[in-house]
């Protein structure tokens, strides 16, 4: 293939990449999201919300793909892997039990809780269809500390 064909292919790929609608944003809870935890991850401040006993509530308009990024706090002296759980309730009827087990990541720090370390992130994806959806995140009874999302 000659150089003209390569340039047309590259131009087409660049055009497709820039015209495709890619968007990612942090969703704030519509209910019970007053308490926040700021973690320092790779020298950047990241905002997390703890899942307490009353849970977190979100209202989302679809179609969309949601990614739940969670971490679990542990005391600095603990070095082994830790398991943590939480529950996702979609539209008040469908329940998803999410279980993670991750090791402690040494590079993450908290401004509010300097004596804690945090696990590697546990990611969970949900695809939502068109329409308005309510999502409720609930704490598992087995977790000693609140899961951060």
Feature roles, as predicted:
Residues 24-63, 74-78, 99, 105-116, ...:
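Glycan-recognition and processing domains
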Residues 2-10:
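Bacterial N-terminal signal peptides that target proteins for export
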Residues 69-73:
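Short edge beta-strand/loop segments characteristic of extracellular beta-sandwich folds
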Residues 78-87:
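Short coil-to-beta strand junction motifs in C2/discoidin
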Residues 76, 90-149:
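Beta-strand-rich ligand-recognition modules
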Residues 55-66, 125-131:
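Extracellular and analogous surface-interaction loops
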Residues 10-18:
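Bacterial N-terminal signal peptides
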């Amino acid at each position: 293939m000659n150089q003209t064909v390569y340039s047309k292919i590259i131009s087409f790929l660049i055009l497709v990449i820039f015209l495709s609608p890619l968007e990612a944003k942090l969703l704030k809870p519509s209910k019970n999201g007053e308490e926040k935890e700021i973690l320092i991850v790779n020298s950047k401040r990241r905002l997390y919300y703890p899942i307490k006993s009353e849970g977190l509530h979100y209202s989302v308009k679809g179609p969309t793909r949601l990614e739940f990024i969670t971490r679990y706090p542990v005391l600095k002296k603990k070095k082994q892997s830790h398991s943590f759980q939480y529950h996702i309730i979609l539209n008040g009827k469908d329940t998803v039990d999410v279980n993670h087990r991750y090791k402690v990541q040494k590079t993450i720090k908290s401004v509010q809780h300097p004596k804690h370390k945090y696990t590697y992130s546990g990611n969970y994806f949900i695809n939502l269809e068109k329409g308005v959806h309510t999502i409720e995140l609930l704490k598992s009874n087995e977790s000693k500390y609140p899961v951060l999302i």
